[in-house]
Amino acid sequence: MAERPARKAPMTHVGRVVRTERLTPHMQRVVLGGDGLSVFSADEWTDHYVKILFTPPGVSYPEPFDVQQVRADFPRDQWPVPRTYSVRAWDPKVRELSLDFVIHGDAGIAGPWAARVQPGEEVRILGPGGAYAPSPEADWHLLAGDESALPAIAASLEALPPGATVHAFIEVTGPEEEQQIATDAEVVWLHRGDRPVGEALLDAVRALEFPAGRCQAFVHGEAGFVKELRRVLRVEHQMPREDLSISGYWRLGHNEDGWQASKPEWNAQVEAEQETAA
């Protein structure tokens, strides 16, 4: 696979809500547009993501907005609260950005916002970031994740050429959470039910008879099962690190702030445990 380029410094953009749509009982789409996205672009990677910057109640920031200046001038409890979301789609012709949100009632910040936001409202976003897209050099592709990875997996499937060899596994709570994806690849929807998150994914990947040739894998979602799937791919199947895009998007028992703070240490521990055995 080609070597990844250095990451560019993220830019701040302002998106205006164009429309919203409830895709499934627990997945809400918010489409952003407007002049504030005039220099935004997200057409390089299929795992592009943005950080939505939520302003704490009662706080306002000087214009032009500069997140680094805000962090220097404002007390920490008045900083924008970032929440990271994958880009489901970017349409450069009409300059519309689609973001999908998992809804868990009133829990969290981003989900409740997505459920209630109305067209015309504006929100600041930082980005995009990203580092993965299906490579034509791969003989076959493995895509596996939970609801949090569904937007990036769907974007990746839609970017693959017809006839590509793909094994795609997406774990959701039940059949009502399945979505239509514009791909000729077979998507295996795994229904979690009352099982722990990721358990069905682990079983499915372990049971998979790996095709011959070079695999490129995209595995994302809850950190616990991602760690175990990394062991399956890296240690048991001896996949090269450069062919793996694998990371915990979230972790049970942690909000995003706590997870992002502890993620470097978590990743270092996973590396120390698994790279010795690989």
Task: Tell me what each language-model feature is.
Residues 1-278:
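Extended, composition-driven regions rather than compact fold-specific motifs
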